[in-house]
Amino acid sequence: MASKITGKGSFRGVPFLIEEEQGLDGGRRIVSHEYPLRDEGLTEDMGKRLRRYQVSCLVIGDDHLAQAEKLIDALEASGAGTLKHPYFGTIEVRVDDYRAKNSTNHQRVTRFDINFLPAIEKNAPEIAEDTAYSVLSEYQATLNSLSDEFAEMVQDVSGFIESMVDNPLFRLADTTAAFIENIFEGVANTVSGLTEVKDKALSIKNRLSNLLLTPKVLAYELQQLTRLNVRSAVNSQRQFVQHIVITDSISSALGDLTATKNEISKSTLDEMVTAKTNNVAETEILARQFKNLHEQEIFDALMNKTTFLLKRLVLSTLAVEYGKAISDAVTESVAQKTVTEETIATLIESKTDVQRYIAEVDEQLEAVILDNADAEQWTSYAALEQYRLTLMRDLQIRGERLANAIEVKLNDTYPAILLEYRHTGNSKTWKRLALRNGISHPLFCLGGTTLEVLQ
């Protein structure tokens, strides 16, 4: 049995009685286009029109004016409110307009005509965060932080070396040149296709005396030397394999270079700089900080500090560049909205690829973050940690736009073009399937093997 219409309603908890007629307007937003001197025109559907609830109600009684004031206060309050209506039910609405009427013919009554609109909050396009731009901004900020702290500490070290030897600049140049020769030229000799790196390293060595006068410029040059260049999809996979080889080679060379050396802590160096600022003589500072060491051992310790600073700058820059290259590869893959026969297999094509590279770059960044923390280089530590968080967020958000990858185990031998059509409905992308799975002959995808197919 249908429920009885009571004739009672309320808005924001203020009660009223409905009158005979209640209205509801709606429809579509149709725009008509008519042109002069033409007999035809056209109409355009711009979407659904918002419903308009027309409520005719009243309050009655000896205190009807007080009741009317309460309802008016509710109607004029800001924001959405709850309308309870015997016909429309309970809905969240906003007040468009209202009209209150009093008549001498009907005493003890105030009538209202009210127009309500639905309270729809999310009716505008949502602002999407440009995570790729955030990575780009953090990338540059991180490199700047690394070079700033490196330059500051190298300057502090060189200030104490000046008090110990003649021509301290040449001693620093010798240490830095040996570092570049052992690390970059050694890597260029073992990894093919890195003649550009070798030439760049030689150029820096030839200008070291001038570069050490401006350590920030030296840091920039070393960062340029370690930079990865992913120039196109064709060579991106080779570049990333090369990066792994370079990183391993540099890490090994740096490990050998610093294995037998001890590093002066940053807190010790800061104490020395503070004492120097307070006009304490350098010789007195060194004697106080290194009581049990001879002068040559103190000099070696300061030079070793320079080597450790160079090592930390290079490894941190490598990790940052690797993350930037992965973000760029995702950008390239997301940009390929349509896949044709000419589409080239990119480095990162699926959510699975993204997850794999997230784990790899996170591991590399975490290693250099902890290394900087152990060395008390807090500026570099904070910048690297912020970069890591921004990069991880970017890869996770934009990685969701990429295709899913499924593994298919073949029970027979098929051509790649048939497999691609069977699992994606598009045979034009068979080259990508072959490249992704390293298929030597696309006509023979051998039975018993497992292939990864993008959907």
Swiss-Prot record:
GO molecular function, one term: DNA binding
Entry-linked InterPro entries: DNA_circ_N
Biological process annotations from GO: symbiont entry into host cell; viral genome circularization
A Pfam entry, by short name: DNA_circ_N
Family: To phage Mu protein N.
The protein, known as: Mu-like prophage FluMu DNA circularization protein
The species this protein was found in: Haemophilus influenzae (strain ATCC 51907 / DSM 11121 / KW20 / Rd)
Transmembrane parts of this sequence: none
Keywords in alphabetical order: DNA-binding, Viral genome circularization, Virus entry into host cell
Residue ranges flagged as DNA-binding region: 368-387
Superkingdom in the source lineage: Bacteria
